[in-house]
């Protein structure tokens, strides 16, 4: 491996013992020549560290950072501060990455000098519902290189866009240049991050290939049963997201002017993501 890895893969780990074996297998199957895997243990109380230690003997380039439990955003920021790769990725350990995902995105990014390379994925449900693409193929086909705000407009206009980091890789210098970080303690922190990253990016390309299974299950932080306390916390998160999105809109007025959905669909998505149904 070269001194500077081509890709830094940053993932938060909190009580992920049952998911880690599949996650490591997914990373191994990427067959990358130049990468580092940075795992941030966010105060796990299960055997996550035991599983990680076993896989460290099998995989090279695995770095483990420790912190008290502070949530996904802080864990990602900790990993981001330690990352040295030319590109960055932020997968979730309880999802599935298909072989070729990062190789494909890296080839796109290197060939076209991209700030962000992005792909499609699949919703996989724990019960009943059939799996289906995150971005319907008829609404969001593969693109050439686009300015980030143009891609954001197309994606929002599809009415099916999902604000997530884990379908993307980011050029590290681009992230440094704009001093991007994840908002500590914020549920659905990917909404403001993704919105601003796309508004700031000059070169973005999307492939409709489905490389990532997003599992919607009861143990996901985003899909836990809700009570009155969690509904109130969700409302506070929603208000914070709206404040952040409005500030982002004001930082990029010339670009937002051409994206009507930035004024309504992004806040709508924040509401849908942060406030579960109480019916």
Which residues fall in each region the model found?
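A conserved acidic beta->alpha catalytic loop
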Residues: 26, 41-50, 68
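Acidic helix N-cap motif at the loop->helix transition within catalytic regions
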Residues: 18-21, 46-55, 96, 100
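Cell-envelope/extracellular polymer assembly enzymes that use nucleotide-activated donors
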Residues: 5-8, 36, 192
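Short, well-formed alpha-helical segments that are part of the catalytic scaffolds
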Residues: 15-29
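Short aromatic/hydrophobic "clamp" motif used to bind/position activated sugar donors
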Residues: 88
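Donor-binding/catalytic cores of nucleotide-activated saccharide
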Residues: 72, 93-205, 212-231
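Glycine-rich, basic loop-to-helix element that forms the pyrophosphate-binding segment
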Residues: 67-83, 93
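C-terminal subregions of glycosyltransferases and related glycan-biosynthesis enzymes
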Residues: 215-279
């Amino acid at each position: 491996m070269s001194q500077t890895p081509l890709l830094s893969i940053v993932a938060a780990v909190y009580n992920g013992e049952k998911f880690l074996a599949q996650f490591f297998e997914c990373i191994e199957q990427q067959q990358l020549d130049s990468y580092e895997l940075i795992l941030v243990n966010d105060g796990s109380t299960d055997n996550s560290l035991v599983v990680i230690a076993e896989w460290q003997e099998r995989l090279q380039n695995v770095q483990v950072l420790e912190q008290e439990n502070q949530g996904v955003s802080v864990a990602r920021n900790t990993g981001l501060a330690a990352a040295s790769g030319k590109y960055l990725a932020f997968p979730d350990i309880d999802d599935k990455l298909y072989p070729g995902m990062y190789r494909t995105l890296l080839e796109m990014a290197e060939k076209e000098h991209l700030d962000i390379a992005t792909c499609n994925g699949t919703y996989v449900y724990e019960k009943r519902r059939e799996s289906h693409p995150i971005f319907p193929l008829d609404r969001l086909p593969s693109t050439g290189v686009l300015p980030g705000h143009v891609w954001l407009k197309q994606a929002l206009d599809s009415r099916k866009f999902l604000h997530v980091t884990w379908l993307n890789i980011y050029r590290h210098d681009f992230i440094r240049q704009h001093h991007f970080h994840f908002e500590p303690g914020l549920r659905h922190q990917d909404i403001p991050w993704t919105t601003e990253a796309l508004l700031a990016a000059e070169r973005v390309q999307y492939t409709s290939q489905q490389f990532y299974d997003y599992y919607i299950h009861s143990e996901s932080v985003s899909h836990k049963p809700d009570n009155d306390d969690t509904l109130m916390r969700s409302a506070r998160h929603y208000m914070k997201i709206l404040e952040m999105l409005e500030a982002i809109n004001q930082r990029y007025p010339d670009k937002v002017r051409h994206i009507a959905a930035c004024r309504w669909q992004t806040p709508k998505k924040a509401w849908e993501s942060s406030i579960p149904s109480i019916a």
